[in-house]
Every structure is written in C-alpha cells, then in structure tokens.
C-alpha cells in the first residue's frame, strides 16, 4: 500500500516527543534505563512508537493480539528511524461476563483502557501510537486514548472470528446465548444444548456478526483511523498478517507528515462513521462510543446526529443478529472498502476526509472491488434496501426525556403498545422467564442498571437472547436504562435517560401500566396520568448504591449520562 499526504508539509522531527528524554544531557538516569532495555547508541535518535495491545489469554477476541503486536513491532523496527516499544492494557470479555455482575465492568473498561494508554504514552513520551484491540470496548478505549494524546496513531483491529458449526448449522456466540431460552422452554435437548456450546466459538477473533466489535471496527476504519480492510480482514488470515507488516511504513508516513488524530477525526469523518453503522445494521453501542470518541477529540456529536443520519440512510447489509451473514462473508466480496466505494459513488459519504494512509477516504478505495449485486445478497443496492431508513432510532417522551436508543430492524414492526412487566435487574428478568411471568403483548422493563444504577450500564444480551429463545422475541418488547449487546435483536429500547436512580420515569413504572413505543414518530411513553406519576414520585425511595468503593463507585460518581456517551473525563 502506498502512503501519502496532499497537504503542505513543514520539516518535522520524528522524535519530537521522545527526544525530551533521549536527547537531554540532564537525564542520565533516563538514558541508563534505555541502555538497560537494550538500546544501542543509534536508537536514541529514533522516533519511539508505543505499540499497545489488549492481549490476554482469557478471551478468544484477544488471545492472538500479542502475536499481532510482535509482528507490528518487527515492522516498526525494520523501518528506518523508528523503534517500537510494546506495552499492554486490560480488557473485559463481554461474551464471558454477560449475564452476571461482572458485566458491570465492561463499559468501565473503555475508560480504563483510554486512561492507561494516555498515562503510559504520556509518561514515556512516545512519538506515535499503534493500538491493537480485539473485544468491544477495546476499540473506543483505544481511540479515546489516542485522541487525548493527539500524536500520530493507527488502530489495527484484531479481526473477526470464523463461524462455528454443529450438525450442519452455522453458529456464533449469539447461538449459545439463545440456546438458554430454548433450554428453558424445552425446545432443545441437553445433547444439542451442549453441542451448541462446544462449537459456537471455534478459535481466535471477535464475535462474528455485526455485533459491537465488528460494528466499531467498521466505524473506525470509515472514520479514517485504521488502514483499509482492517475491519473486515479476519483474525486468522494472510491479509491480517500483511496488514501488520505495513504498519511500520504507515506510522512513519504519519510522523513525517505530522498527521494527527485531530486532522482525521473531523465532524464529517464522524458522520461517515455513523453512516456505515446504519448501512451495516450495526450495534446500538455505536451511539455511546462514537459520542465518546468525538468528545475526546473536541468534536460535538450528539444522539440527534444519529437520528438525522438514520433518517436518510438505509440498511443495506444483511448481517447477524437480525440477518443471515457474518463479517467473514463481507471479507469474501471485497471487504469494507467495497462498501465504502459503492456509498461514495452514490453520494452517501464525505470522500475528502483524510485517513491514516495520508490519503483521502475516496483515494483509499479507488482500487477496491465493485459490489456485484447479482452474485451476492450480503450487501444490497440502495434501490432494494433491507430497511429504507436506519435501524437505530432516538426516541423521546415522558419515559425518556433525555432520549433513548431503539434498534428497529423493521422485521419486528415499528409500533408496540403493551403491558408493563417490571424487573429490577437482569436476574429478576431471567427468573421471570423461567416462571412464565412474561407473555405475548408485554413490555419487559429492566431498570436500575444504568451508568449510575448498575453501576456501569451492563448489557442485556442474556435477557434478550432468553426472550428470543423462549419464542417471545416477536411478541414482546424490552426497554431498559441499561445497554444492549450488538448481538441483541427484537423490539428493544435502551440507553433511557434519565435512568431510574437519577429520577427517570422508568423508576416509577409498575406492572400492568401501558407503554407505547412508536419508532415512526420516535416516541416512548408511559400511559399513566400526571397525577398518578406525581403520587408515585412522592413515595419513591432511591435504591441503595450497589458500589461504594473501587472502580465501579468511581465510574458511578464521574460518568455522564448515556446520551453524552458515559464519558468520565469532562
């Protein structure tokens, strides 16, 4: 791949940060430390590239990132004038933590990742950053950290997993989640239940549908912070290896041209990222994370920007969880650049946005394959969309005065009016499914699990999967002040603001109340009189905080509401 920059370039020192330590004669102890890690005399004038991965053994999404990091370090070290230094930060496996109290730490991990990248690179004076994320919150955490530093940076996505298979049926992580509901209702044998569990995840790579990891990887490539094809190159592929080999030259180009995240992450670039989320049918979590990433670089993106773009952007990708295909299938027909090329041709993207190649988005995809709509149905043309407008809708009303996020594919309809069934937390809901408390026509209300109330705003993938598995996915709706996984589908509304513990009306809903959700007029309402609401509010007792010490308590104290991306650094 060729790298270039069309702007005017002044003479730039590649080591303008690291020279603070390596070239200062009053820093002898610092320089002794460098000799201690193996520096040679010639290394002291090189630009230092911090290479951070979220590698750890305990998650398929992340288990291979150390290997990719080593390959990237080799690429950097083979590039004249650069030296790579690896470091690591944490992650949380959403697939493992989902359904239990550990899931409260997932969103929190985004902030920990961002803070740790900023902290390490800021203290060590790295001249550039390469981040290698795998699981969901890894991606925005990496971008937020790099944006705060505002030094030449590239994100290398760890890549998507291959599908699993059992008895001739293709499987993925959501197959395992939904098998629980099938088991509860007696719709799957013990043998097949175990067979699904054993075969859903065949190895390394992020969850394979258009779930949160793949959604964000696609959004970030479109934003311009990854090399072309990074989001669609599978974890186990020659293309992913070749991508790592290119990083040395790519990061040197950014250093030479002094191209920083602030040059790339513009308002128009974020609009491109939101557009691709809609086109691919991506995760609701993109709303939270894109707002947070924009905040980190000083660009104002709000929920209403998502609605504005949703109104003019169709869903064209037939991807799981609501569709048929996985990210590996997109790779086979030309990857994300093929989609971007088509959207640019149709006038749906800002083609002049700068990217980490030093070229514009339009220049990056000039040689990409053209989508052939006659030979595949993974991606549809604009004239035959899966849904004429975006699937992510921002709903307001007395239940969500600060807004909420609905994921409406169109297959479940766009209007739901039903009877409330209230659950104070995730386990309460699962108990309700097992006891038969939920019936067709009900609106499940799961509350007290927002950013403050959770704390940490856990995902409700286990409840929505149980609902689908129990055969109620098309006849019930679910609303919450928590989040949803990218694997969630059905008639669902999350991110309700204000949340229950912050005075939101969702905290006052009672069983048998009528709730109306209108995704055409973008409203969500509790059909209870003002007098009754006032009476309930007068009698309301705020729940005792679930965390009083540690990182969860810190998050609850610092976080902004979901409508502002749950950022903690304002």
UniProtKB/Swiss-Prot annotation:
Record keyword Iron-sulfur present: yes
Sample GO molecular function, one term: magnesium ion binding
What does the cofactor field's note say?
Binds 1 [2Fe-2S] cluster per subunit. This cluster acts as a Lewis acid cofactor.
Q: Which UniProt keywords apply?
A: 2Fe-2S, Amino-acid biosynthesis, Branched-chain amino acid biosynthesis, Iron, Iron-sulfur, Lyase, Magnesium, Metal-binding
Tell me any Pfam family this protein matches.
Answer: ILV_EDD_C
Q: Which reaction does it catalyse?
A: (2R)-2,3-dihydroxy-3-methylbutanoate = 3-methyl-2-oxobutanoate + H2O; (2R,3R)-2,3-dihydroxy-3-methylpentanoate = (S)-3-methyl-2-oxopentanoate + H2O
In what pathway does it function? Amino-acid biosynthesis; L-isoleucine biosynthesis; L-isoleucine from 2-oxobutanoate: step 3/4; Amino-acid biosynthesis; L-valine biosynthesis; L-valine from pyruvate: step 3/4
Q: Kindly indicate whether the keyword Iron belongs to this entry.
A: yes
Q: What is its EC number?
A: 4.2.1.9
List the disulfide bonds in this chain. Answer: none
Name the residues that bind Mg(2+): 94, 136-137, 459
GO biological process annotations for this chain's record?
isoleucine biosynthetic process; L-valine biosynthetic process
- SUPFAM superfamilies per record: IlvD/EDD N-terminal domain-like, LeuD/IlvD-like
Q: Which residues carry this modification: N6-carboxylysine?
A: 137
Which residues of this UniProt protein bind [2Fe-2S] cluster? 61, 135, 207
Q: Which residues cross the membrane?
A: none
Q: Which residues form the active site?
A: 485 (proton acceptor)
Superkingdom, taxonomy of origin: Bacteria
Q: Which cofactor is essential here?
A: [2Fe-2S] cluster; Mg(2+)
Subunit composition?
Answer: Homodimer.
Q: Which family does it belong to?
A: Belongs to the IlvD/Edd family.
The free-text function statement in the UniProt record for this protein reads: Functions in the biosynthesis of branched-chain amino acids. Catalyzes the dehydration of (2R,3R)-2,3-dihydroxy-3-methylpentanoate (2,3-dihydroxy-3-methylvalerate) into 2-oxo-3-methylpentanoate (2-oxo-3-methylvalerate) and of (2R)-2,3-dihydroxy-3-methylbutanoate (2,3-dihydroxyisovalerate) into 2-oxo-3-methylbutanoate (2-oxoisovalerate), the penultimate precursor to L-isoleucine and L-valine, respectively.
Name of this chain's protein: Dihydroxy-acid dehydratase
**What is the organism field in this record?**
Lactococcus lactis subsp. lactis (strain IL1403) (Streptococcus lactis)
